[in-house]
Amino acid sequence: MKLALTFLLILMILPLMTGEKTSDDLELRGVESLRAIFRDRRCSDNIGATCSDRFDCCGSMCCIGGQCVVTFAECS
């Protein structure tokens, strides 16, 4: 049972840690993404989607003015 739970947890965390490195806080973003999953929050990849913070928007998008927008600079 413990082995199955460990395997499931690894499968959940692995996609959060893979991908292109765009900043030094990759590990922190992975942890925050995992917290969002446990809170049942999902990010939106739609431009103009309503958001309340930067974790509501996926990828290189930031939450500016309550909407997800594409940015080239890191979100603040």
UniProtKB/Swiss-Prot annotation:
Q: Name one GO cellular component term.
A: extracellular region
Chief place where the protein resides: secreted
Tagged with keyword ATP-binding: no
Highest taxon of source: Eukaryota
What is the name of this protein? Conotoxin Im11.8
Disulphide-bridged cysteine pairs: 43-58, 51-63, 57-68, 62-75
- Native organism is Conus imperialis (Imperial cone)
Organism lineage reads as: Eukaryota, Metazoa, Spiralia, Lophotrochozoa, Mollusca
Function of the protein: Probable neurotoxin.
Q: How does the entry describe the domains?
A: The cysteine framework is XI (C-C-CC-CC-C-C).
Q: Where is the signal peptide?
A: 1-19
Which positions are cleaved off as the propeptide during maturation?
A: 20-42
Q: Where would you find this protein in the cell?
A: Secreted
Molecular function GO labels: toxin activity
* Family per similarity comment: Belongs to the conotoxin I1 superfamily.
Going by the UniProt record, its keywords in alphabetical order are:
Cleavage on pair of basic residues, Disulfide bond, Neurotoxin, Secreted, Signal, Toxin
Q: In which tissues is it expressed?
A: Expressed by the venom duct.
